[in-house]
Amino acid sequence: MEELLPDGQIWANMDPEERMLAAATAFTHICAGQGEGDVRREAQSIQYDPYSKASVAPGKRPALPVQLQYPHVESNVPSETVSEASQRLRKPVMKRKVLRRKPDGEVLVTDESIISESESGTENDQDLWDLRQRLMNVQFQEDKESSFDVSQKFNLPHEYQGISQDQLICSLQREGMGSPAYEQDLIVASRPKSFILPKLDQLSRNRGKTDRVARYFEYKRDWDSIRLPGEDHRKELRWGVREQMLCRAEPQSKPQHIYVPNNYLVPTEKKRSALRWGVRCDLANGVIPRKLPFPLSPS
C-alpha cells in the first residue's frame, strides 16, 4: 500500500531531500495545531505570562505562531491553510497577534493566540508519531551519507574515513590531533542547528569547589620551578644567616691611643706679660734687682 501525502505525491517515489521537506512540513503543521515545538515561548509562559490574567480559561497553553520562517526549507503550503486547520481543531480562547521586525527591515506578523485543548487528540498523536518515525529514518540516512562529506571537508587521514561522526569526535578528542572546540563544527553546514552544543571537555560538577591545600602546593610548585634571574634560594640564605649567628668569634681589640704632649707655643705677648708681672711682684716686696738691665748715667 503506497502512502499518499496531502499534496498527492507518493512517499516511496520521493528523493531523500523531498522526504525530509515533506515530513518537516507535515510535522510543523501538526505541531502548530497542537501548540508544541516553541521551547523558548513555553518556558516563558511557564515562568510568567503577562496576558494570563486577561485569559478567559486559565491554564491553557499558547499556540505556535501561525507564520513560521525557515532559513533552508521553503514551505509550499500557505499559512492560511495551517491557520484554518488549527482553527477547526481548536477554539481560540484569547487572540494575540505579534508584529516583529527583522534586521533586514522585513515585517513579520504572527498569530500567537491561546487556544484550548484538542478534542481529537488521539488521531493527531498517531499522525505525529508516524511523522516522527519518518523524520528519524530520514535523519539516520543523512547521517550515513554525511559521514563521507565530513571526512572530505576536514581532509582527515585515510584511517579516519568511513567512521561515524560520534566515533570521529571521540577519536579526535582522545588522540589530541586538534579537535574542534565544539561538536557542531563537525556537523554539515546544510543541517540546521537548533542550539549550541556544550563543549566536549566538560568540567566536573565540583568545578566551583577548590581545595585550599592542593591550591597552596600548586602555587608552591610553580614558585619553586619559576625563579627570577639572580635570586638566591631562600632555604640556603636562611641557613647561611643562621650559621653566622651561631658562630662566636673572638672580638678584635681596638688599638689604644698613645698620648703625645704638645709643646707648641703660640707667638703672643705671654713672655712680656710674665715679665711685667714679675717686676710688679719685686717692687711690691722691696726686692732690688741684682743686675740692672741698662747702665746708670751720672747725674
Swiss-Prot record:
Query: Could you name the domain of life of the organism this protein comes from?
Result: Eukaryota
What's in the GO CC field? centriole; centrosome; cilium; cytoplasm; cytosol; non-motile cilium; nucleus; plasma membrane
Q: Name one Pfam family in it.
A: HYLS1_C
The Gene Ontology biological process annotation of the record reads:
cilium assembly
Location of Phosphoserine modifications: S179
As for subcellular location, the record says:
Cytoplasm; Cell projection, Cilium; Cytoplasm, Cytoskeleton, Microtubule organizing center, Centrosome; Cytoplasm, Cytoskeleton, Microtubule organizing center, Centrosome, Centriole
| InterPro entries named in the record | Centriolar_ciliogenesis_assoc, HYLS1, HYLS1_C_dom
The answer to keyword tRNA-binding applying to this record is no
Task: Report if keyword Metal-binding is assigned.
Answer: no
Question: What are the alphabetically sorted keywords of the record?
Answer: Cell projection, Ciliopathy, Cilium biogenesis/degradation, Cytoplasm, Cytoskeleton, Disease variant, Phosphoprotein
PANTHER family for this protein: CENTRIOLAR AND CILIOGENESIS-ASSOCIATED PROTEIN HYLS1, HYDROLETHALUS SYNDROME PROTEIN 1
Q: What family does the entry list?
A: Belongs to the HYLS1 family.
- Job of this protein: Plays a role in ciliogenesis.
- Report the disease annotation for this entry: Hydrolethalus syndrome 1: A lethal syndrome characterized by polydactyly, central nervous system malformation, and hydrocephalus. The polydactyly is postaxial in the hands and preaxial in the feet. A highly characteristic hallux duplex is seen in almost no other situation. In half of the cases, a large atrioventricular communis defect of the heart is found. The pregnancy is characterized by hydramnios, which is often massive, and by preterm delivery. Defects in HYLS1 may be involved in ciliopathies other than hydrolethalus syndrome 1. A homozygous mutation resulting in a C-terminal extension of 11 residues has been found in patients diagnosed as Joubert syndrome, a ciliopathy presenting with cerebellar ataxia, oculomotor apraxia, hypotonia, neonatal breathing abnormalities and psychomotor delay.
Its protein name is Centriolar and ciliogenesis-associated protein HYLS1
Q: What is the species listed in this Swiss-Prot or TrEMBL entry?
A: Homo sapiens (Human)
